[in-house]
Amino acid sequence: MERLVERLASAETRGDAILLLGVTAAFAELFAACRGHGRAFRLGPASRVVDTGGAKGLARPLSRAAFLRECWTLLGVPGYYCVNEYGMTELCSQRYDSALDDRFHGRGLAPRRLVAPPWLRTRVLDPDTLAPVKEGDAGLLCHHDLANAGSVSVVLTEDIGRAVAPAGIEVLGRAPGAPPRGCGMLLADVLAP
């Protein structure tokens, strides 16, 4: 983290725009390091943040709103320039937060949602019956990815979410009793003594 903080300071001094990509849990570590050093940055105005993996494995939960607040407070990157990615090893395609696209297309007040390329569809299913839920209700996320031509094209997850218009989803968490999964969990392994 020390080297990253030094590089952020250097980028800030030069006014460089940077792209920070990482698992959400690593950003939580960066935020803690910034606070520990009493340091906040004002990165170049074209700087962007892309995070993935959610807050799994964190000792202290970090909500999406808190994450966006920390990006602004500690990095100087506004929330509309922070993009969340949702994907998994089993899928060839990913979903991305709509905020940046919404901003550039004049939809600034549209609800944040995870949008996908046209070949990826997600259905929201009742956990007990696997029937589709009513519009707006939460359920298990079932992804149909046509890019998975060489393997299975349908992946039923233990992620709970809901459909969000237009053409998006919101991930709410994991099904009760489902083990945590994802790249955010790897950081805990890396940081373990």
For the regions a language model picked out, list residue spans one by one:
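Active-site glycine/GP-rich loop and adjacent strand/helix microenvironment
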Residues: M1-P193
